[in-house]
Every structure is written in structure tokens, then in C-alpha cells.
């Protein structure tokens, strides 16, 4: 019985396969990048923040509203104890909150109070206050579809910045801090719109 010689793919076939794989990779990267950019878009940019009045997580008998926060900028950070990315970004958020550049308000979303309190006890509480929206109804007005999500609201109640996803130190330094500086230096000027990349 004679063995037929093994045939190896021709260089032309290998080049074609590699070309197709590279094309698929480029298309995937482009689609993912455009989806990421679209996911950060917020119809609220440059507009008044939605009204809210929600109970405090630590004392549900007390409520806090957007009018209580008016007059100075604040960062509204949407999180949940069930959110793995929220736990990952917690040290970055804590470090930023310690700088006291802006009030950091926690927005506990679609969570059980007991779980949220335990999470803050274990990972630390960087927030000046934490509001609770266990049903997620108020978050609809903000366009929240995932946690973590972060909004920067200026002293006039205008949404100046929005980011869906975990914050990192580079984003804080290169995106958030320049917008805060802009707000601090021109609190009555017309707001510039900023979107996370």
C-alpha cells in the first residue's frame, strides 16, 4: 500500500485565510469600539438633571433630592452590591473621593438594602451620602441601563459628564478633573458638553 504524499496548504491559501481572519478581527474591533462609544452617549448632557427624591440607604426615614444638592457640583455614582465592576473600581473611587474635589453621592440601584450596607462595610464607603432606588424606577429618568454609571452635575443642576462603566485613574485625571476645573473657573458660564470616550 503506497502512501500518497501529504499535501500542505499552498501559500496562496494561507494568505487568503490570514486575510479573512484579519478582516474579521478588524470588523469586530470596529464594531465593539463604536458600540462602546454609543453606550456612553447620554441624552442628558447639557440638560438639567432629572428630578429625584430618594431615601438614604443608611436611614430610609430621610430623603435627599436633587434640590438638596443644588448650588455646588456633585458626582452621582450608580452602583450595586451585585456589580463586579463596581467592586473593581471602588479603590479608584475611594481615592478620588478623599481628594474632596467634588461631592460624591452614591446611587444604590436595584439592590437589597442589607446587601448594599454589607458591601459598603466590607469595601469602604467613599460617598458623602447614598440614596437607594431598589426598584430602579427613578434611574429610568437618568437613562441608567447598567452599573456602574457616573454623572457629573454642576452647581446649576446641569449634567456635564457621563460615563457608563468602571472608572479608572486615567479617566479621572484626563476627563473628569479638567471638566471639574472648567466648572470651578466658570461656574456661571454656559456648560461645555463632555462625553467619556
UniProtKB/Swiss-Prot annotation:
Pfam families, sorted: Redoxin (PF08534)
Gene Ontology MF annotations: disulfide oxidoreductase activity
Boundaries of every Thioredoxin domain copy: 43-181
Main location: membrane
Periplasmic side: 33-197
UniProt signal peptide: none
Disulfide-linked positions: 83-86
InterPro entries, sorted: Periplasmic_diS_OxRdtase_DsbE, Redoxin, Thioredoxin-like_sf, Thioredoxin_CS, Thioredoxin_domain, Thioredoxin_ResA/DsbE_sf
Alphabetical UniProt keywords: Cell inner membrane, Cell membrane, Cytochrome c-type biogenesis, Disulfide bond, Membrane, Redox-active center, Transmembrane, Transmembrane helix
Membrane-side (Cytoplasmic) residue stretches: 1-11
Role played: Involved in disulfide bond formation. Catalyzes a late, reductive step in the assembly of periplasmic c-type cytochromes, probably the reduction of disulfide bonds of the apocytochrome c to allow covalent linkage with the heme. Possible subunit of a heme lyase.
Family, as annotated: Belongs to the thioredoxin family. DsbE subfamily.
Name by which UniProt lists this protein: Thiol:disulfide interchange protein DsbE
Amino acid at each position: 500500500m503506497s502512501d500518497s504524499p501529504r499535501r500542505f496548504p499552498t501559500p496562496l491559501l494561507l494568505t487568503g485565510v490570514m486575510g479573512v481572519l484579519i478582516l474579521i478581527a478588524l470588523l469586530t474591533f470596529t464594531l465593539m469600539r463604536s458600540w462602546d462609544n454609543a453606550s456612553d452617549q447620554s441624552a442628558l448632557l447639557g440638560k438639567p438633571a432629572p428630578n429625584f427624591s430618594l431615601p438614604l440607604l443608611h436611614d430610609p426615614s430621610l430623603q435627599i433630592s436633587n434640590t438638596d444638592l443644588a448650588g455646588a457640583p456633585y458626582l452621582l455614582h450608580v452602583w450595586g452590591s451585585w456589580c463586579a465592576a463596581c467592586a473593581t473600581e471602588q479603590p479608584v473611587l475611594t481615592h478620588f473621593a478623599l481628594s474632596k474635589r467634588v461631592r460624591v453621592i452614591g446611587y444604590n440601584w436595584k439592590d437589597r438594602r442589607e446587601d448594599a450596607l454589607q458591601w459598603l462595610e466590607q469595601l469602604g464607603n467613599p460617598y458623602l451620602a447614598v440614596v437607594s432606588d431598589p426598584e430602579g424606577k427613578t434611574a429610568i429618568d437618568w437613562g441608567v441601563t447598567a452599573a456602574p454609571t457616573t454623572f457629573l452635575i454642576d452647581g446649576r443642576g446641569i449634567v456635564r459628564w457621563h460615563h457608563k462603566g468602571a472608572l479608572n485613574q486615567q479617566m479621572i485625571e484626563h476627563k473628569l478633573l479638567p471638566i471639574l476645573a472648567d466648572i470651578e473657573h466658570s461656574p456661571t458660564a454656559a456648560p461645555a458638553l463632555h462625553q467619556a470616550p
